[in-house]
UniProtKB/Swiss-Prot annotation:
Recorded coiled-coil stretches: none
CC terms in the record's Gene Ontology section: extracellular region
Stated family: Belongs to the neurotoxin 03 (Tx2) family. 06 subfamily.
Lineage: Eukaryota, Metazoa, Ecdysozoa, Arthropoda, Chelicerata
Entry comment describing in which tissues the protein is expressed: Expressed by the venom gland.
Compartments, as annotated in UniProt: Secreted
Protein name: U8-ctenitoxin-Co1a
Keyword Secreted: yes
Matches recorded under Pfam families: D_CNTX
Domain of life: Eukaryota
S-S bonds: C4-C18, C11-C24
InterPro entries cross-referenced by the UniProt entry: CNTX
Keyword Secreted tagged: yes
Domain statement: The presence of a 'disulfide through disulfide knot' structurally defines this protein as a knottin.
Length: 31
């Protein structure tokens, strides 16, 4: 739901992890 590894940022795309700019990232995320 846009939350991953303690992050709570809005995701611009449909992804489980999102970075500071709203980009999808998967570092530290185990699907």
């Amino acid at each position: 739901d846009g939350k991953c590894a303690g992050q709570d940022k809005p995701c611009k795309n449909s992804c489980d992890c999102c970075g500071a700019r709203g980009e999808c990232v998967y570092t530290g995320y185990x699907p």
